[in-house]
Amino acid sequence: MSAVQLYLASGSPRRQELLTQLGYQFERVVVDVEECHQPSETAEQYVQRLSRDKATAGVKKINATKTAVATMPVLGADTIVVVDETILEKPKDFNDAQRMLNLLSGRQHQVMTSVTVATVEREETQLVVTDVWFKTLSEKEIEKYWQSGEPQDKAGSYGIQGLGGKFITRIEGSYYAVMGLPLVETDVMVQNFLNL
């Protein structure tokens, strides 16, 4: 196994899978960042702040636990779903997921994923916005989907890469950003930090 090249400040199995798909060796660093939208923030500002907060929290945590200053970059990311200027994050319970999926049903929405790569010296953030269209969903489909367990840890209460993919009629943008990590943009940023 090759040497670790960067840290991932995320517990998301999908982000771990996608970073592995890019061929990077990484270590996970667990960070605790409060995800609370400020009234003055746009959706774009909010998701970018969260990815920056996660990456910089990772940098601080690594520096606090290592004897030498960490030189490896830390990658933080966050994904939100936006419909009618309403931000949809992870559902709290079935009623919340039902509300979200009913909002998305038969309509277009946006998935915003922000990725930040940071070190002590610098940071870079990139936002990728993808338009997604849903078919009209029945209450039975929503309930059955919730019972699958899939929507419970996903922004907007669905996963494009799983059962939720059957609700999607069209997509414009990055499929991988909807999953949680845009591959092209992430790869360019990481290569830039690693001088590859």
Curated annotation (Swiss-Prot):
Residue pairs linked by disulfide bridges in the UniProt entry: none
Domain of life: Bacteria
Pfam family, one: Maf
An annotated GO BP: nucleotide metabolic process
CDD domains: Maf
Residues annotated as transmembrane: none
Obligatory cofactor(s): a divalent metal cation
Enzyme class: hydrolase
Reactions accelerated catalytically: dTTP + H2O = dTMP + diphosphate + H(+); UTP + H2O = UMP + diphosphate + H(+)
GO molecular function, one term: UTP diphosphatase activity
Record EC number: 3.6.1.9
Any Gene Ontology CC annotation: cytoplasm
Major location (coarse): cytoplasm
Cellular compartments annotated: Cytoplasm
Active site: 78
Site description Important for substrate specificity, residues in chain: 14, 79, 161
Entry keyword set: Cytoplasm, Hydrolase, Nucleotide metabolism
Family: Belongs to the Maf family. YhdE subfamily.
Function: Nucleoside triphosphate pyrophosphatase that hydrolyzes dTTP and UTP. May have a dual role in cell division arrest and in preventing the incorporation of modified nucleotides into cellular nucleic acids.
PANTHER family the UniProt entry points to: BIFUNCTIONAL DTTP/UTP PYROPHOSPHATASE/METHYLTRANSFERASE PROTEIN-RELATED, BIFUNCTIONAL DTTP_UTP PYROPHOSPHATASE_METHYLTRANSFERASE PROTEIN-RELATED
HAMAP family listed in its UniProt record: Maf
Stated name of the protein: dTTP/UTP pyrophosphatase
Species, as recorded: Photobacterium profundum (strain SS9)
